[in-house]
Amino acid sequence: MAKQSTLGSKELNPRQVEENNLLATKLSEIYKKWGYQEVAPPQVEGLKTLMAGGGIDSKEILKLVIDEPVGLRPEMTASIARAASTRYVAEPRPLRLWASGTIFKSREESDGKIVIDESLQSGVELFGIEGMEIEVELLYLLIESLKKLNIDESSMPILLINHISLMELIISKFSKSSKEKVTDILSNFDLIEIEKLELDFDERNTLKLLQELRGSPRNVIKTLESLYGNNKILDSLTKIFNIIEPISNKYNIQLQLDPTFKPHYELYTGIVFELVCNTRETPVVIARGGRYDELVKMFNENPEDEIAAGFSYSIDKIRELNTRLETFDTNPERILVAYGPNKTIKDAIECQAKLHEKGYVAIIELNSCINEDHAMKLVNQRKCTKLKWINS
């Protein structure tokens, strides 16, 4: 019999579970204030849905061996998009949904071993609004919810944003044969491969400039306009940044526009973003999302009618941050109810019930104690802070 959990799966201690629950609760509270309704997408879905129209590699899906091709969800967006386009298709738009749950990813290590990555996610999906307003609401909600989590400023959060069409704009000036290679070079920040490409002097310099082009949205947009002229996407991004910049400054969240940023999943068709925070060891992505019109249209009988975007937080990654732990009730008063030879377990339960009614955490010492001194010695062992002794 195995004595350890499966490689990559999570086994949390009580403190971690408590923190996860509190973080998820904090997020759900703000989702509800913004009018989002909770749904519970299935953990097991058909592979066609889980692959999100080819946006998610089947190798990342943990497959189950049954009659139908199914697997465990590697994320929740595709399942919620399917539900929005079928079960909730008659619901008025905009349709605001949120969900929280465990996701499972499969990956192969260098030695060939298959590892399961299990994590707790919480996020929102917004359906049915065409135009930049959908992105504005989601980015604003993302920033507001981050503030609700009371993450310490030492985490120095950065909201990294891009638009899928910016990469298309960038590669438009390159030859058809080199476009795919240029995309890979920019996405992977590959300086060596630039020198191997057959480019003229101006193209090579432009590519090097673009590879370094990230940071202040205003400066990046200005540079892109100088290279490619006025563009609807750049105009839309300017309007979005003008709206969200004041709140990001208020909460000390740095905004960055990175035209070469490419999300891991290829299901997005508009704005994409990641929320990155520093830990004691390395930066971590605690949230990611974007617009995925094509995915939701795949499930809809009237595809021209449906628009969608969303984001999700990784609760486990947030827990790694320097969160202000005073927001967690980590040391509540815990009362040990112990009884002596003259009392019974029934007396202890009645006493415990009265303490519970007053709001205390109270646990029972199931065996009777010889005397009060004996009971006092058990207080620390039972991880309690106080003794309630009953014997007469």
Swiss-Prot record:
Q: Does the keyword Amino-acid biosynthesis apply?
A: yes
For this UniProt entry, what's an example GO CC term?
Answer: cytoplasm
Q: Which organism was this protein described from?
A: Prochlorococcus marinus (strain MIT 9211)
Ordered alphabetically, the record's keywords are: Amino-acid biosynthesis, Cytoplasm, Histidine biosynthesis
Task: Please give one Gene Ontology molecular function term for this protein.
Answer: histidine-tRNA ligase activity
Q: Where are the transmembrane segments?
A: none
Family membership noted in the UniProt record: Belongs to the class-II aminoacyl-tRNA synthetase family. HisZ subfamily.
User: Other remarks on record?
Assistant: This function is generally fulfilled by the C-terminal part of HisG, which is missing in some bacteria such as this one.
Task: Tell me where it resides.
Answer: Cytoplasm
- Pathway where it operates: Amino-acid biosynthesis; L-histidine biosynthesis; L-histidine from 5-phospho-alpha-D-ribose 1-diphosphate: step 1/9
Q: Name one Pfam family in it.
A: tRNA-synt_His
Q: Which GO terms describe its biological process?
A: histidyl-tRNA aminoacylation; L-histidine biosynthetic process
**Which protein is depicted?**
ATP phosphoribosyltransferase regulatory subunit
Q: What SUPFAM superfamilies has UniProt attached to this entry? A: Class II aaRS and biotin synthetases (SSF55681)
State the oligomer form and interacting partners: Heteromultimer composed of HisG and HisZ subunits.
Task performed by this protein: Required for the first step of histidine biosynthesis. May allow the feedback regulation of ATP phosphoribosyltransferase activity by histidine.
- Domain of life, per UniProt, equals Bacteria
Please verify whether the record's keywords include Cytoplasm: yes
Q: What is its main location?
A: cytoplasm
